[in-house]
């Protein structure tokens, strides 16, 4: 919770079931009984004086996999919750009408201190959106409201910010 984060001896950000990630779940195609808890994740990279941070709440209809190995990390469980089953295959098997259109939005932000213009930030967000497709399956369904934003904290017009070409 917020008090745990505030009283922590670490400079690392608190992640998981906190803030917007509190109610986040994945693998919800068969309802919450077979879904799995997810949450909020944060990752930062430094390049010289520049920092790029991604913060994402994973609240997807689909399964979550490691983008390098394809190993499922979280998602739809079988009815006795002993193993994972494919959310994508289940979606195709059970195309019967059901209310899947609420509670499935993975939302994120890419934040940097480098000076990017609006078009460049839009491109950064577009590239970051591709990460969803590498890790969430299925992604971008009619039942998902996935989105990602990009923003810069660089000041404009005072000569402090350095422009970075992408």
Summary of predicted features, one role per range:
Residues 1-166:
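A structural signal for small-residue-enriched, beta-sheet-centric alpha/beta enzyme cores
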